[in-house]
């Protein structure tokens, strides 16, 4: 296999994704602009959605799963009176209704849609059915019957009513929640039909719009590069560990850090800075830190502290030419 082309660049760029392109389009565009060897994103936004799209480079891609699992916030406009094949503006009209709910009627249905609920995904989604993408089946005239899936919706707030036909909502939710489905379900619960006409993600894990850059704020024109600025990045990046700031920190010594990096386990009782007794369960993650520097994530498994996902390797400690195949336990670098 040939060596990946590009530079070793590490960090997060938080993009304010514009309407139109897919999330993958934006990753590819920015990977090219940064000449990065490795890039990925922290949660898909539909082409007709805008807002916070975290894009990871290098080491930061190791933290993508924690951003995907993180809490997210959205603001969307629900247009009443038309249901559509895609549950957004892009689709064809399926049904119409003259009913327009009042503010009180809308607020009355929101509690039943909040919490741990079952949600039917949009037919036009990337879910696989028998190896095929649901949206491919729908476009081929074979829309699949998608079963309800568990969804966690923390809060739904009616923000404003621009007019009788529309309502604006602010939503906080867990991973994998479809705002198009939620908009559809709000309308149905109100005795009418509807679809999303505007969708914007305002927060994704620790990242919000205050961190985000528009595509116009990123230097994409490589023709302006000179010998003097060839290594300059098109935009500044956030540290790779920024994605982990919501995870509790655990101070470790150099010796303990080396053990974790090498894939060796540690008896929690032997730690210089012990774990709280109430936090030694296997569902707890910790940021292993030496001073202010994050080595990576660790957790307790089978009674011992082990690496879960490391950002650093032996080179952080000034060690070189290490053969990990000869270590007692491999780890993920």
From Swiss-Prot:
Keyword annotations: Isomerase, tRNA processing
Asked whether the keyword tRNA processing is assigned, the reply is yes
Class in the EC hierarchy, top level: isomerase
Has UniProt tagged this entry with the keyword Disulfide bond? no
Q: Which CDD domains match?
A: PseudoU_synth_EcTruB
Q: Which InterPro entries match?
A: PsdUridine_synth_cat_dom_sf, PsdUridine_synth_N, tRNA_psdUridine_synth_TruB, TruB_C
* Gene3D superfamilies linked to this entry: Pseudouridine synthase (3.30.2350.10)
Please give the catalytic activity noted in the UniProt record.
uridine(55) in tRNA = pseudouridine(55) in tRNA
Give the top-rank taxon of the lineage listed in the UniProt record for this protein. Answer: Bacteria
**What would be one Pfam family of this protein?**
TruB_N
EC code: 5.4.99.25
Question: What is the active site of this protein?
Answer: 46
Example GO molecular function: tRNA pseudouridine(55) synthase activity
Stored SUPFAM superfamilies: Pseudouridine synthase
Signal peptide residues on this chain, from the entry's feature table: none
Q: What intrachain disulfides are recorded?
A: none
Annotated GO biological process: mRNA pseudouridine synthesis; tRNA pseudouridine synthesis
Give the matching PANTHER family.
PSEUDOURIDYLATE SYNTHASE TRUB1, TRNA-PSEUDOURIDINE SYNTHASE
- To which protein family does this belong? Belongs to the pseudouridine synthase TruB family. Type 1 subfamily.
Q: What does this protein do?
A: Responsible for synthesis of pseudouridine from uracil-55 in the psi GC loop of transfer RNAs.
| Identification of the protein by name | tRNA pseudouridine synthase B
Per the UniProt record, the source organism is: Gluconobacter oxydans (strain 621H) (Gluconobacter suboxydans)
Organism taxonomic ancestry:
Bacteria, Pseudomonadati, Pseudomonadota, Alphaproteobacteria, Acetobacterales
């Amino acid at each position: 296999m040939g060596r990946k082309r590009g530079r070793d660049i590490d960090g997060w760029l938080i993009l304010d994704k514009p309407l139109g392109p897919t999330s993958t389009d934006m990753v590819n565009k920015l990977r090219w602009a940064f000449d990065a060897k490795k890039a990925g994103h922290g949660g898909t936004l539909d082409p007709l959605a805008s807002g916070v799209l975290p894009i990871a480079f290098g080491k930061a891609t190791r933290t993508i799963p924690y951003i995907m699992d993180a809490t997210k916030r959205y603001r969307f406009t629900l247009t009443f009176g038309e249901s559509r094949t895609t549950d957004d503006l892009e689709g064809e009209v399926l049904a119409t209704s003259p009913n327009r709910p009042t503010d009180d009627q809308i607020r009355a249905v929101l509690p039943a849609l909040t919490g741990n609920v079952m949600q039917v995904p949009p037919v036009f989604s990337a879910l696989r059915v028998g190896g095929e993408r649901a949206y491919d089946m729908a476009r081929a005239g074979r829309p699949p019957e998608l079963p309800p899936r568990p969804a966690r919706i923390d809060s739904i707030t009616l923000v404003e009513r621009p007019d009788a036909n529309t309502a604006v909502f602010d939503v906080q939710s867990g991973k994998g929640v479809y705002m198009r489905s939620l908009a559809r379900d709000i309308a149905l619960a109100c005795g009418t039909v509807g679809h999303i006409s505007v969708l914007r993600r305002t927060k994704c894990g620790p990242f919000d719009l205050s961190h985000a850059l528009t595509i116009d704020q990123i230097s994409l024109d490589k023709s302006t590069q000179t010998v003097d600025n060839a290594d300059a990045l098109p935009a500044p990046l956030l540290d790779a560990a920024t994605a982990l700031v919501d995870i509790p920190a655990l101070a470790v010594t150099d010796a303990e850090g080396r053990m974790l990096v090498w894939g060796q386990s540690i008896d929690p009782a032997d730690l210089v800075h012990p774990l709280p007794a109430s936090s030694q369960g296997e569902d707890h993650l910790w940021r292993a830190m030496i001073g202010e520097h994050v080595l990576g994530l660790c957790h307790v498994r089978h009674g011992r502290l082990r690496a879960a996902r490391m950002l650093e390797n032996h080179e952080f400690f000034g060690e070189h030419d290490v053969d990990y195949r000869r270590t007692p336990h491999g780890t993920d670098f």
